[in-house]
Regions:
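A generic transmembrane alpha-helix motif of multi-pass inner-membrane proteins
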Residues: 48, 58, 67, 74-84, ...
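Membrane-embedded alpha-helical segments of transport systems
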Residues: 1-8, 144-156, 245, 275
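Extracellular/periplasmic helix-exit of transmembrane alpha-helices
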Residues: 76-92, 145-188, 255-262
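Helix-loop-helix junctions that connect adjacent transmembrane helices in secondary transporters/permeases
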Residues: 159-204, 213, 217, 228-234
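Transmembrane helix-bundle signature of multi-pass membrane transporters/permeases
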Residues: 112-115, 142-150, 206-209, 304-307
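Select transmembrane alpha-helical segments in multipass membrane proteins
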Residues: 1-2, 37-40, 98-113, 154, ...
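Helix-loop-helix module between adjacent transmembrane segments
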Residues: 1-49, 113-117, 205-215, 234
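Helix-loop-helix connectors at the membrane interface of multi-pass transporters/channels
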Residues: 12-36, 127-150, 185-188, 214-242
Length: 370
């Protein structure tokens, strides 16, 4: 489910940005329709999902990664060198700046998704492990990549705070920019901080990089299903049997958004929650593995406990999950989040998961002594 969600959001987002780039370049007609570009991306996804990882993207992926890093550096450099932009001092603005007063806990941790911790990245472990020469490279590749992505997320957060108007302590300017869509906001930030060069980098960094993540997601979904169903993937016919349903679901969600009957922000939130929940599960699994290997398991057990609280709290509070049952609505609109119920449930769930883990470790230790 997560992998298909990843593929979907990384098809719809780039398609929207391409449309923005085309419109701002003076184009019109078919080239300025999201559906057109979405279909092109989905066709590419089908080809990339069908063939091996090294057939298309394996050799040029590092180039796109470098472009993404250069774009992030360019954004922060553009902020620091322009006296009109000032990043708000963190302690003076240590408050909820969301115009709609959406709770920071745990919406912020779900929204940032891959910028903090990513279950999706863990699904790529089997593929990436085959690309490394030794286990020691795992620290640099996996941990290093997540730290790098976290820095990029912080840069974009800083850009959102520095470039847009803050009214009465709320990020009203950023909310207005995002009202035109995430693609328009990305285009605006790159244009303001880097000019024409920024727009070109946005094309590479925010269009091509997500697309390459999307094709990886769909390919991984195919391989995961193949493992579950014991379907050999050497045969092109067997690959096709899995490619069609996997891409079919992604196409339904993506085209549904392009045609206006599926909300992209809802797809993104479901992806984000699924992503962080998988991260929680993997952290608990890693904790038990480290315990059995007689290594320091607290380095994963502590973040696993934290992510348990994050995932559970969001599931209870979010309108697209259980929020409609406990939050306050007026005339069909959300007016208040019931944090008094959601926060304790999230904390209790996290404590219960930690207690279950500790019980499992003691049970394993006792069985080893017997």
């Amino acid at each position: 489910v997560l992998l298909i969600m990843v593929g979907t959001v990384f098809a719809v987002g780039p398609a929207g940005l391409i449309v923005t780039l085309c419109k701002n370049s003076g184009m019109s007609g078919l080239l300025t329709t999201t559906l057109f570009w979405l279909i092109i991306i989905l066709v590419y996804y089908f080809i990339a999902t069908f063939i091996s990882i090294d057939a298309i993207i394996g050799k040029i992926y590092p180039v796109f990664g470098i472009c993404l890093i250069i774009m992030a550096v360019g954004v922060i450099f553009g902020i620091f060198t322009n006296p009109a932009y000032t990043i708000p001092e963190i302690w003076a603005n240590f408050s909820n700046m969301h115009p709609s007063n959406t709770p920071i806990w745990s919406f912020m941790f779900i929204t940032v998704a891959c910028g903090a911790i990513s279950g999706f990245h863990s699904t790529q472990s089997p593929l990436m492990a085959r690309c490394m020469k030794s286990e020691k490279q795992g620290h640099f590749v996996f941990y290093g990549a997540m730290v790098c992505e976290g820095v990029i997320a912080l840069i974009w957060a800083a850009a959102g705070c520095a470039l847009y108007t803050i009214t009465d302590g709320k990020m009203a300017g950023l909310a207005e920019a995002l009202a035109a869509g995430q693609s328009a906001a990305i285009y605006d930030v790159c244009a303001k901080t880097m000019g024409g060069v920024g727009i070109a980098l946005a094309m590479i960094g925010v269009v091509i990089c997500p697309v390459t993540s999307g094709d990886t997601a769909f390919r991984s979904a195919r391989l995961t299903l193949a493992d579950w169903l014991k379907i050999d993937q050497d045969s092109y016919a067997n690959r096709l049997k899995l490619c069609i349903p996997v891409l079919g679901v992604g196409a339904f969600l993506g085209i549904g958004n392009a045609m206006g009957f599926i909300n992209y922000t809802v797809i993104w939130r479901y992806f984000s929650w699924t992503n962080q929940t998988l991260a929680m599960i993997v952290l608990w699994a890693a904790s038990m593995y480290l315990f059995k290997e007689k290594k320091n398991y607290w380095i994963t057990a502590v973040p696993a406990t934290f992510m348990s609280a994050v995932s559970c709290t969001y599931f209870v509070l979010a309108p697209e999950c259980l929020g409609k049952m406990i939050n306050t609505y007026a005339d069909g609109k959300l007016v208040a989040y019931n944090t008094a119920v959601a926060y304790p449930i999230g904390i209790i769930f996290a404590i219960a998961m930690l207690a279950l883990f500790i019980h499992a470790t003691k049970k394993h230790t006792a069985s080893q002594k017997a």
